[in-house]
Amino acid sequence: MTGISTIHFLRKTIGFAAALSFATAASAQDIVSFVVENHGKDDSNIPATFGSVFVRGDLPKGASLSAQANGQPVALQLDAKATHPDGSLRHGVITLSIPHLKVGGRTTVLVQRASSAPPPAPAVTIAALPADFDAVVTLKFKDKVLVASARKLLAGGKPETWLSGPLVSEWWVSGPFRDKNGAADPHLYAQFGIRSYGRGQPLRVEVNVENDWAYVPGPRTAFYDAQIQANGKVVYASGTGIKQPSHSRWRFGFWWDEPVATYVRQNLPYLERARAVPNYDLSIDVAGSALRELADRFEAAPRSPMGSSIIEKYMPETGGRWDIAPLPHWQALYLLTMDPRAYEVTLATADLGASFSSHYRNLKNHQPVTLDAYPKFSTHSNLVGRGPDQLPLPDAGGYTDPLTPDAAHEPALDFLPYLITGDRFYLEELQFWAEWNLSGTDPIYRNFADGLVKFDQVRAQAWSLRTLAQAAYITPDNNPLKKTLLKQLKANIAWYDNTYAKSPSANALHVIPQDAPYDGGTAMAPWQDDFFTWSIGYIQGLGDVDASALLRWKGKFAVGRMTAPGFCPALAAAYTLRVRPSAKAALYANFAQVYDASLPTQLKRQPPDRTLKCGSSELAAALGLPQAGDMVAEPTSADGYTAYMQPALAAAVDGGVPGADAAWRLFQSRPTKPNFSDYPDWAIVPRKN
């Protein structure tokens, strides 16, 4: 078992009643409210640390933050992390000290723009740690023992400060594992995160075991038993041996003594107003059975280090599944319910995403590898081990890693966990995946350091751009990767603008053709293109790059399938559409040609020898649809191709694409619709609504 149940204590909780009371803004100073619950014991001055985004302009540069509950002030510490282009706060880590809260109780905390800065107060320092503080990680191999000690690393160098203030401070130290003679292992590396709420107060310790250096000779799979000791006891023992492939890592966290057992329910309407998360339909009442099924599947899945829990082990696996959507199924459930069970799954899966071999750390600066630092960096199998500019070939030691990453089927594992917790681990995970997505080709095809994703499948382009934009959006301003991520995002949007949105020779269908890979090079998957359209709309909302021209151009494909002359919406969400007559021919010039070429491929039975009128019962029968006016491709499924189209149409409405409002109304008027209460992953609506 990983340390999730010790850092995130909620495995045994069932969840409070769903009805929440969020305070509404009563004055211009009010920003957002949170609900804080006590899942521990009756206590006073209870700390709660969590991440929060801020709507652009809500907390201007130089302004301070304050909090109150029941009209009484609540001590607050803000560690600012990322800002909007106007200098206002975008993301930070908030720590509250709740004066008193009974076990099982909850209180609504209103966060406001302070009228004046709080008086200065001394920050918690390392001197607050217990005199005997240490956390020791021991890795036992067949022929050696390697050890890393937090105490020795604290004594040997200056720690990195992640949080600092009067309520909480957090420090990070790191170093190689060493053998009995003190010799450093060239590959295995330990990180310790130490969060102190003050002398005699709760203390959280996090251990990360890393096997992820890039460009270090001889990368290998490591086989060992692991043990972590702290505060006079063994807090973790691996039991069966751990098999850790190169370019992976794992995490374990624990409380030194008494845990902090507060749970913070985020404010989804505010998150959506900040445009940090997809605009889910807030009218959806998530079924309790969906949460129970999630909890049951999660409990049945292995969660030990190097496991994957309910993440698909083999990411290239095709077909609908829980981890593929704008955000994974469990994150959609979490956002729409704020249920502790979904919260725990959201964090646990983010932890276990570290098990995949998609992690390359730069030995020179200890940051995730970037293409700026290594423009010829590539993880493509044709290049690894093929020269001095390329990565060395790993030695798996006879072990076949069951986990395979894939950009085309990559879940958004880490953005939301970092957003809501502010945990440094999740930030690095997000950065690792963002840069890995750009590396899977010959560097010339991505224009080296630009990191263009045009080389990949359309769905891979969609998900890679999503992850890159999330990393650029939320990486702290002072983080070395911030400028690189923003530059790569802007380079990608510029390429699409020049190739499509602003090109007089761009295709009339407004598709990303990618050689139309279906039906002998004549057809493409509109649902993959819809993923891309949603992603561009999401990127535009995040606000770091102007993607408006691309969104207006791209959204016309979704709108055209609903409203273009000669194209019946019955085929709008088909699995494939014919977009050219032969593999070497030009794309069709209009949607009517696409419809005429595609209709015969969709018929379930040969119709009578007469024209099939759009919206008619005859067409519905020929297509095997439940009712006239329905759309092909799983019209009743909340995880079907019709559902996949919904976020793209919503993005088109948000982007002001001509005809998008009419297309959305027509889409919503179809008689057969999915029930999103069990599966809300694609229940995304226009932000105008």
Feature-to-residue mapping (PLM):
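Glycine- and charge-enriched low-complexity intrinsically disordered segments
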Residues: 146-152
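Alpha-mannosidase-like glycoside hydrolase catalytic domains involved in N-glycan trimming
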Residues: 29-145, 161-176, 195
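N-terminal signal peptide c-region/cleavage motif recognized by signal peptidases
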Residues: 23-26
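Catalytic cores of extracellular degradative/oxidative enzymes
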Residues: 165-689
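Bacterial N-terminal signal peptides that target proteins for export
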Residues: 2-14
